[in-house]
Amino acid sequence: MHFAREGYLRIFGLGILCLVLNLLGFTKLGFVFLLLTFFIAYFFRDPDRVAPEDDRYLIAPADGRVVTIEQNVSNDRWSTAPATRVGIFMSPLDVHVNRLPASGVVESVRYQEGKFRPAFAEDAAQVNEQNGVTIQDARGRRVVFVQVAGILARRIVCSLKGGERVRQGERYGMIMLGSRVDLYCPVEAQIKIRVGQAVKAGETIIAEYAERTSNASPP
């Protein structure tokens, strides 16, 4: 089992504190911090995932449950072209690491301040704090995915930069304490999931294009 790099210092620090408390005789308090250490380790877990390696597919950028599938979204703040928006709600118990839904070149990374309403609320995608990424694949198709903060999750982590070449299934960030990730699929991609379905980042196929490009590697 791997852990997200953002968690190593926290896990190590709590582990040392737990050890010191036990050595000083504060065993009950040490036990409390031991439980806390296990909780933090679970929170930052980062299991390996096997991507389909087929660029006909757009894969899930987050673990969680599909809460919305909205057809023909256009003139949105993140996507001016018509798209299908798939919203994935991440509970505090889900893996919090986010993965790339497609290969290509990062066109833009945009952060927007906002509120911290519950991520499953209908207006969360419009009013909450969020970070959106646009990728252009080898055939010029644009895919947008947006990390949305929630009532508990108030820290968004994204390591991507404009101009960077990326590969489908790679880790690119996380949202502390879960929340929501929205994936904007081009209208020509056929949606393969349904509302209420559980999905896994880097593995679950969200949508499929009719044709396949040369391979799933960045151009």
Regions found by a protein language model. Give the residues of each.
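Contiguous, well-folded functional domains in the mature portion of proteins
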Residues: 1-219
